[in-house]
Amino acid sequence: MKAGIHPAYNEISVICACGHSLKTRSTHKGDMRVEICSSCHPFFTGKQKLMDTAGRIDRFEKKYKASRVGKAAPTT
């Protein structure tokens, strides 16, 4: 690598809003603050909110049922 053209690569602390922090290396200067991390994100903590997909499918079928009425089934 050429000397003097690359940014400084330093060890920084990434600090979450929940208080969790971790060390990493980056070209970012100073500490990095984030709103969410793996310690507090619902996907990683298991407190994930599941959507009602069955209800969404029913609404979709109800909405487009009128457009299918009277049309012949596709032939193969």
UniProtKB/Swiss-Prot annotation:
<feature type="binding site">
    <location>
        <position position="37"/>
    </location>
    <ligand>
        <name>Zn(2+)</name>
    </ligand>
</feature>
<protein>
    <recommendedName>
        <fullName>Large ribosomal subunit protein bL31</fullName>
    </recommendedName>
</protein>
<comment type="function">
    <text>Binds the 23S rRNA.</text>
</comment>
<dbReference type="InterPro" id="IPR034704">
    <property type="entry name" value="Ribosomal_bL28/bL31-like_sf"/>
</dbReference>
<keyword id="KW-0689">Ribosomal protein</keyword>
<dbReference type="InterPro" id="IPR042105">
    <property type="entry name" value="Ribosomal_bL31_sf"/>
</dbReference>
<feature type="binding site">
    <location>
        <position position="40"/>
    </location>
    <ligand>
        <name>Zn(2+)</name>
    </ligand>
</feature>
<keyword id="KW-0694">RNA-binding</keyword>
<feature type="binding site">
    <location>
        <position position="16"/>
    </location>
    <ligand>
        <name>Zn(2+)</name>
    </ligand>
</feature>
<dbReference type="GO" id="GO:0006412">
    <property type="term" value="P:translation"/>
</dbReference>
<feature type="binding site">
    <location>
        <position position="18"/>
    </location>
    <ligand>
        <name>Zn(2+)</name>
    </ligand>
</feature>
<dbReference type="GO" id="GO:0005840">
    <property type="term" value="C:ribosome"/>
</dbReference>
<dbReference type="GO" id="GO:0003735">
    <property type="term" value="F:structural constituent of ribosome"/>
</dbReference>
<keyword id="KW-0699">rRNA-binding</keyword>
<keyword id="KW-0687">Ribonucleoprotein</keyword>
<keyword id="KW-0479">Metal-binding</keyword>
<dbReference type="InterPro" id="IPR002150">
    <property type="entry name" value="Ribosomal_bL31"/>
</dbReference>
<dbReference type="GO" id="GO:1990904">
    <property type="term" value="C:ribonucleoprotein complex"/>
</dbReference>
<dbReference type="GO" id="GO:0046872">
    <property type="term" value="F:metal ion binding"/>
</dbReference>
<dbReference type="InterPro" id="IPR027491">
    <property type="entry name" value="Ribosomal_bL31_A"/>
</dbReference>
<dbReference type="GO" id="GO:0019843">
    <property type="term" value="F:rRNA binding"/>
</dbReference>
<dbReference type="Pfam" id="PF01197">
    <property type="entry name" value="Ribosomal_L31"/>
</dbReference>
<keyword id="KW-0862">Zinc</keyword>
<comment type="subunit">
    <text>Part of the 50S ribosomal subunit.</text>
</comment>
<comment type="similarity">
    <text>Belongs to the bacterial ribosomal protein bL31 family. Type A subfamily.</text>
</comment>
